[in-house]
Amino acid sequence: MTSATLAGRRALVTGGSRGIGAGIVRRLAADGAAVAFTYGASAAEADKLVAELTADGAKAVAIQADSADPVQVANAVEQTVSALGGLDVLVNNAGTAYLAPIDEFPQEEFDRVVAINIGGVYSAIRAAVSHLGEGSRIINIGSINADRVPTGGTAVYAMTKGAVASLTRGLARELGPRGITVNNVQPGPIATDMNPDEGEFANAVRQTTALGRYGHTSDIAAVVSFLAGPESGYVTGANWNVDGGFTA
């Protein structure tokens, strides 16, 4: 562990077995939190991450759940509470994308993108909120596409992330009197296995960022860790663009 700023905190990260989610799980665990995370299909990836964190002395639990299914999401929350003894931090990271022009967008793909990117966030918060006490944190992982849509075919994805930003603001008002903060982290171009930082497209993206580079999962995880910790207690209802100046 690198620090103990989150010692005693119990966190659930949806979609935490790979990419940005795995980066968040690693950072929260390194900062002292006990962490549960959900995964979709790859039990091998999830088990490997649990083994890695456990070897480092962290408490980690992997839970299989389809974020498009409200029942599975609710069950994941209950399993987290049972395994960790409670819940203080919910990070809604699970998401999906399907890119196509609107007149070529399959209805079944539209339904699934909405079910995961909006429904999954709603379902997790609805199930978790009764377990969250004063000082708890809800952190949504949105996208800078909620504010800027630079290419065609991304309208549906951007719509879902815009909905998450609106939900964040509304719930910040609703849950503020209970001492629960709600914030939205909006990543820009982040290098992952699904979003490589090499190739012609990546070179074009780099030219649109103020810093001239892709971000790393650790860049997102650092902001999430701050929002999960004690020093962010007066921060709520905010959209945090972590994008290297992509939206500047």
Where are these regions (language model features)?
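Alpha-helical segment proximal to the catalytic Tyr-Lys
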Residues: 130, 173-177, 233
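The beta1-alpha1 cofactor-binding region of Rossmann-like NAD(H)/NADP(H)-dependent oxidoreductases
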Residues: 43-44, 64-76, 107, 218-219
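Residue(s) in the substrate-gating loop at a strand-loop-helix junction
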Residues: 143
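Active-site helix of classical SDR
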Residues: 125, 160, 168
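Substrate-binding pocket helix/loop in short-chain dehydrogenase/reductase
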Residues: 101-102, 106-114, 205
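A conserved structural motif in NAD(P)-dependent oxidoreductases
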Residues: 210-220, 231
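Conserved glycine-rich cofactor-binding loop
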Residues: 17-18
